């Protein structure tokens, strides 16, 4: 079976929750899954005063270990319609892997959160996916076979480009059951794709 990394950055815990759901989905397809986060670059005193969630249990990833996985699912919240600098800085350090083609043909995917329904979900997903394409990765999104993103009965995240959640202007909204189902669906689809590509 395939080996999957769920790599995320979470300021207030929404993406941490989504990452766990993505991992659940990947494990349900038989994949071996690690959940890791990128380093926080905001000084701890400032992060604490801004109420960042600093007690996240996932270990911090290193760039060099990325090539050890068959699939990498990247999650980060939006910052003005793109991924935040914490994730951008981490991926920028993967130039050596890019130069060697170390990630060519591996499976990639993205998930995100925004404060509002129209707060940059798709552009943030694109900002992540663009990096993964430059690394030579094969992209898996969240197809419309996941019916949860089609509903008009509730405020819900989700796009064909990846699973999403809506956090609210003050971060007061947690991922809904539908959004977590979307994350699990995408995680499972990534793992199933990696299993096919890598002989699982």
UniProtKB/Swiss-Prot annotation:
Substrate binds at residue 98. Binds 1 FMN per monomer. Keywords: Flavoprotein, FMN, NAD, NADP, Nucleotide-binding, Oxidoreductase. One of its GO terms (cellular component) is membrane. Its cofactor is FMN. NAD(+) binds at residue 12. It comes from the Bacteria. Belongs to the WrbA family. PANTHER family: FLAVODOXIN-RELATED PROTEIN WRBA-RELATED, FLAVOPROTEIN-LIKE PROTEIN YCP4-RELATED. This is NAD(P)H dehydrogenase (quinone). It comes from Acidovorax ebreus (strain TPSY) (Diaphorobacter sp. (strain TPSY)).
């Amino acid at each position: 079976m395939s080996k999957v990394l769920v790599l995320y950055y979470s300021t207030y815990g929404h993406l941490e929750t989504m990452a766990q759901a993505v991992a659940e989905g990947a494990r349900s397809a038989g994949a071996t899954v690690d959940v890791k986060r990128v380093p926080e670059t905001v000084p701890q005193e400032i992060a604490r005063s801004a109420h960042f969630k600093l007690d996240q249990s996932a270990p911090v990833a290193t760039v060099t270990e990325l090539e050890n996985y068959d699939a990498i699912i990247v999650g980060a919240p939006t910052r003005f319609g793109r991924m935040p600098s914490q994730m951008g800085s981490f991926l920028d350090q993967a130039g050596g892997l890019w130069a060697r083609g170390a990630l060519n043909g591996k499976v990639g995917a993205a998930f995100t959160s925004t404060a509002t329904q129209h707060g940059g979900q798709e552009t943030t997903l694109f900002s992540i996916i663009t990096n993964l394409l430059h690394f030579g990765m094969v992209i898996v999104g969240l197809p419309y076979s996941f019916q949860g993103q089609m509903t008009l009965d509730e405020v819900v995240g989700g796009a064909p480009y990846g699973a999403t959640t809506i956090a609210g202007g003050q971060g007061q909204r947690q991922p809904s059951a539908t959004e977590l189902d979307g994350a699990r669906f995408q995680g499972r689809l990534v793992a199933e794709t990696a299993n096919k590509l890598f002989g699982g």
